[in-house]
């Protein structure tokens, strides 16, 4: 980040003996005198070997001291010395000019990231060859000699050759070039030429253009975050370009360097931008991120910037993290990563706010570009408090000791900012952070502080204010249990965000549910209006706390309920509401599990769920909580199908809880669904429409969302008009990253297994399945498979291959196990995870069927293996409920024996369980042809 002084004397000769290597190159020049090509080849071979040794030494030192910046500096020093040696070889041996003309001068300069004096193992090298005037034959030869040597060494080099005049002219018009020159560093050649560039760049480009530069850099940052995902808490972060990553630190320093004309971050303390603590934080963040990035490059052997699941554990081990009860080593490492990302965000906010504050009077244009706030030159008291003022539309302290004389102000400042729609002054945020030690047991028990917190939680824009409280540390100190999950990631592919970010996002979605008007939340929004007024606060605190016990040895739902029982009385809840919050947290996964993995047309399923929820009011609250929770997991997780399943479960259960009464009884819901369907097909003849409606069982009308019903009807009609015995319709769901295959065929006892096997043979991983049978014996199944190709056309061709495989198997032309064995492989992401296999068998969830629930590590071909194994166990599959949660597959099968009876014999149940557990534990089962 600083313009590091890359002094090779700072490193031992064992790292890179520059003098000895230079002498060896001189010796090679003598050995190959007059044979330029041989000299070049010998130099490249020699320097490449030295570079390999130096990199190995840097990696060994990194593993020993885990100091990322030092590693990046070592690598940069080595690269600097290689370029200096190549420059000397070119100018002293290859193209020596004993009496150089004025034009035969050149400065070799490092730019961009390399110019900062820090270099990751697989980073590009950016060079600028500065000339006094236009290019000469000598200059071209020297530059080419250096570049070709670097390329022959296998290095990635970006380069430009310009005169000083050209550099200044282009820097004025191109922000990328301007930023690159901002971070130039002299390497070799004519030093006065480089000094001229630096001096002219400062006077002719930088002066008077701070507003333009800052606006451009902040716009670049916003666009980069938009492309990569706005949250800094995405669980596979990009270390370089992600939010809270190295590029954010770079942007921060570029802006500071440009505006304050500093060359080292330490100078920002002298300028009053950072205090000493913030500067130390800057250095710690930089070193940690460089440690991660250097290890990423060393482990992957390429310029890998994404901290993907398959690399996270190895990086954690290299950095010395160990497992603790309730938290794996990789989860502890990633928690540290996200804490650092949070600190980077805080530093960026401090710099931007400080720039605005210092420029508000002198440069209001810059102020507006940075803050996008309307500024003013006066301050006023904040309504309702003499302890705070409004300073340029930002809340600030009226006196330095406002937190000391009343610690409740540490909560009050956030509530006042929320009520008055104010941003936060950087001095206020600093004061808050420095006063966190005042949030003690006495403040946590203070009734006024807890009242203010509940107002924040249940008022407009709670998500934004809670996130600011979290970023300053107040939320985790005031709600101690929340502090334990700050920046905690869960090492799985299901959750997209850290636990604290997930909970805060869930609050945002809860507020969207309450506002209404969203088609995806129709049921939850309706229920939110109908819950008892006193339960509004109950649902808000439940949503905030439902995952607060993650990372503990005990089941997080049970542990979370215990936390709620301790915390809620302090927040002003009575005993009944405290118990309600605890119950909701303990059962917060129940509704989702039942809706997605049980047969909702089975009476026993509904009765057992009703016994759990106990009352309509509790079911309303659980439905709202479940909706917000699933929606907050990440993009594409919530969809119309899951919404419809929750809706079906809710309305199927309501009459059981009310003794037969339901706001919309079952028959009316079926009739309403059919009427809604009819309205979409006014162009169909009445007889045809009636016949089609009669082909579907009641469960279809209750469980399938309208857009899918419409697609089904058009697909079935066109397939039958074309006379197809088997038809496949392909759809794409970009939000979920899946391709949907809808298969229409004659029903067959092995059809699901055949479909699953055909998908496996094409390398397609099934993530969920919706399986329906019509009254006239046709199967209408929708299978969602993980997307493999970027283009829809390629995905469509893969779907066609799957259809052809199904048809060939049904016609007896293809032996499916052989086709599966040829293709099945597991993706590298799944290899990073370990999921304990689980199989449960019970007869309590259904009166007619035995329910087999299987859970284990997902892999291509797993559903095929399971359905094949179940059939070989002489079981009939009546229905299947297929779902994946990241790397975990959870499949539920409703089965009978060959006579149509439940499996009651304990010995037979044990044999089934043993066979399926063995299958789940075997990594290569899918690749083995069946006998």
Swiss-Prot record:
Domain HD stretches: 499-622
Domain note: Has four distinct domains: an N-terminal nucleotidyltransferase (NT) domain responsible for UTase activity, a central HD domain that encodes UR activity, and two C-terminal ACT domains that seem to have a role in glutamine sensing.
NCBIfam families: PRK05092.1, UTase_glnD
Renumbered residue ranges of the record's region Uridylyltransferase: 1-383
Name the record gives this protein: Bifunctional uridylyltransferase/uridylyl-removing enzyme
InterPro entries found in the cross-reference section: ACT-like_dom_sf (IPR045865), ACT_dom (IPR002912), HD/PDEase_dom (IPR003607), HD_domain (IPR006674), NT_sf (IPR043519), PII_UdlTrfase/GS_AdlTrfase (IPR013546), Polymerase_NTP_transf_dom (IPR002934), UTase/UR (IPR010043)
Coiled coil (UniProt feature): none
Example GO biological process: nitrogen fixation
Lineage: Bacteria, Pseudomonadati, Pseudomonadota, Alphaproteobacteria, Hyphomicrobiales
E.C. designation(s): 2.7.7.59, 3.1.4.-
Activity control summary: Uridylyltransferase (UTase) activity is inhibited by glutamine, while glutamine activates uridylyl-removing (UR) activity.
Primary role: Modifies, by uridylylation and deuridylylation, the PII regulatory proteins (GlnB and homologs), in response to the nitrogen status of the cell that GlnD senses through the glutamine level. Under low glutamine levels, catalyzes the conversion of the PII proteins and UTP to PII-UMP and PPi, while under higher glutamine levels, GlnD hydrolyzes PII-UMP to PII and UMP (deuridylylation). Thus, controls uridylylation state and activity of the PII proteins, and plays an important role in the regulation of nitrogen fixation and metabolism.
UniProt source species: Bradyrhizobium sp. (strain ORS 278)
């Amino acid at each position: 980040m600083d313009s590091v002084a890359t002094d090779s004397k700072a490193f031992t000769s064992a790292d890179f003996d520059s003098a000895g290597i230079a002498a060896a190159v001189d010796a090679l020049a003598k050995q190959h005198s007059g044979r330029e090509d041989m000299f070049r080849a010998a130099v490249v071979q020699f320097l490449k070997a030295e570079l390999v040794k130096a990199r190995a030494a840097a990696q060994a030192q990194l593993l020993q001291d885990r100091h990322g910046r030092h590693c990046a500096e070592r690598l940069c020093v080595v690269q600097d010395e290689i370029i200096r040696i190549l420059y000397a070889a070119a100018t002293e041996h290859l193209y020596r000019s004993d009496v150089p003309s004025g034009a035969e001068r050149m400065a070799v300069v490092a730019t961009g990231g390399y110019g900062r004096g820090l270099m990751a193992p697989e980073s590009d090298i950016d060079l600028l060859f500065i000339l006094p005037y236009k290019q000469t034959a000598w200059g071209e030869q020297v530059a080419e000699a250096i570049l070709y040597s670097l390329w022959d060494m296998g290095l990635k080099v970006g380069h430009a050759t310009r005169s000083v005049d050209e550099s200044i002219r282009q820097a004025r018009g191109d922000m990328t070039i301007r930023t690159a020159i901002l971070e130039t560093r002299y390497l070799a050649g004519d030093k006065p030429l480089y000094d001229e560039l630096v001096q002219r760049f400062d006077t002719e480009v930088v002066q008077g253009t701070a507003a333009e530069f800052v606006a451009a850099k902040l716009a670049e940052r916003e666009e980069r975050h938009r492309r990569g995902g706005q949250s800094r808490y995405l669980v596979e972060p990009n270390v370089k370009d992600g939010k809270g990553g190295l590029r954010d630190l770079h942007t921060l320093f570029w802006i500071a360097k440009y505006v304050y004309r500093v060359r080292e971050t330490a100078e920002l303390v002298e300028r009053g931008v950072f205090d000493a603590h913030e500067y130390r934080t800057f250095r710690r963040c930089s070193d940690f991120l460089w440690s991660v990035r250097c290890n990423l490059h060393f482990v992957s052997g390429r310029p890998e910037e994404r901290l993907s699941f398959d690399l996270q554990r190895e990086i954690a081990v290299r950095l010395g993290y160990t497992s603790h009860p309730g938290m794996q080593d990789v989860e502890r490492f990633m928690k540290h990563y996200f804490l650092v990302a949070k600190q980077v965000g805080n530093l960026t906010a401090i710099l931007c706010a400080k720039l605005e504050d210092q420029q508000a009077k002198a440069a209001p244009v810059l102020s507006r570009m940075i803050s996008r706030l309307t500024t003013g030159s006066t301050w006023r008291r904040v309504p309702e408090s003499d302890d705070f003022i409004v300073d340029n539309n930002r809340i600030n302290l009226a006196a330095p000791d406002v937190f000391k004389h009343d610690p409740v102000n540490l909560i009050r400042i956030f509530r006042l900012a929320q009520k008055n729609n104010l941003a936060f002054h950087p001095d206020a945020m600093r004061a808050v952070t420095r006063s966190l030690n005042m949030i003690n047991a006495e403040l946590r028990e203070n009734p006024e502080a807890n009242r203010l917190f509940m107002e924040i939680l249940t008022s407009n824009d709670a998500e934004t204010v809670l996130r600011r409280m979290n970023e300053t540390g107040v939320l985790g100190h005031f709600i101690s249990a929340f502090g334990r999950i700050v920046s905690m990631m869960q090492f799985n592919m299901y959750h997209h965000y850290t636990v604290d970010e997930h909970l805060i996002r869930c609050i945002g979605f809860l507020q969207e549910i309450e506002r209404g008007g969203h088609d995806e939340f129709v049921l939850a929004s309706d229920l939110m209006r109908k819950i008892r007024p006193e339960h509004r606060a109950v649902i808000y605190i439940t949503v905030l706390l439902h995952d607060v016990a993650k990372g503990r040895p005990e089941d997080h739902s049970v542990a979370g309920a215990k936390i709620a029982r301790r915390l809620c009385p302090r927040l002003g809840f009575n005993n009944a509401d405290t118990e309600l919050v605890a119950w909701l947290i303990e059962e917060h996964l129940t509704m989702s599990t039942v809706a997605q993995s049980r047969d909702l047309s089975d009476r026993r399923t509904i009765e057992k769920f009703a016994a759990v929820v106990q009352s309509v009011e509790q079911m309303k609250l659980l439905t709202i909580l479940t909706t917000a929770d699933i929606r907050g997991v990440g993009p594409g997780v919530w969809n119309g199908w899951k919404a419809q399943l929750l809706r079906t479960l809710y309305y199927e259960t309501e009459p059981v809880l009310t003794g037969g009464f339901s706001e919309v009884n079952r028959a009316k819901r079926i009739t309403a669904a059919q009427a809604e369907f009819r309205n979409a097909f006014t162009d169909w003849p009445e007889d045809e429409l009636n016949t089609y409606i009669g082909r579907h069982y009641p469960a279809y009308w209750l469980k399938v969302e309208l857009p899918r019903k419409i697609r089904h009807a058009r697909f079935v009609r066109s397939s039958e008009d074309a006379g197809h015995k088997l038809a496949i319709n392909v759809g794409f769901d970009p939000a979920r990253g899946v391709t949907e295959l809808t298969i229409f065929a004659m029903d067959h006892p092995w059809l699901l297994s055949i479909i699953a096997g055909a998908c496996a043979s094409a390398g397609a991983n099934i993530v969920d399945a919706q399986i329906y049978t019509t009254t006239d014996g046709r199967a209408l199944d929708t299978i969602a498979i993980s997307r493999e190709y970027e283009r829809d056309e390629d995905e469509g061709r893969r779907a066609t291959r799957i259809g052809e495989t199904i048809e060939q198997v049904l016609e007896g032309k293809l032996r499916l196990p052989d086709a599966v064995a040829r293709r099945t492989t597991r993706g590298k992401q799944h290899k990073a995870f370990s999921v304990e296999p689980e199989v449960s068998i019970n007869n309590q969830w259904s009166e007619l069927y035995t329910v087999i629930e299987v859970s284990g590590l997902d892999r291509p071909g797993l559903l095929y293996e399971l359905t094949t194994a179940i059939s070989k166990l002489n079981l009939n599959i009546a229905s299947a409920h297929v779902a994946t949660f990241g790397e975990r597959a959870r499949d539920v099968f409703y089965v009978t024996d060959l006579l149509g009876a439940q499996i009651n014999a304990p010995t037979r149940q044990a044999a089934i369980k043993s066979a399926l557990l063995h299958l789940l534990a075997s990594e290569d089962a899918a690749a083995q042809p069946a006998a």
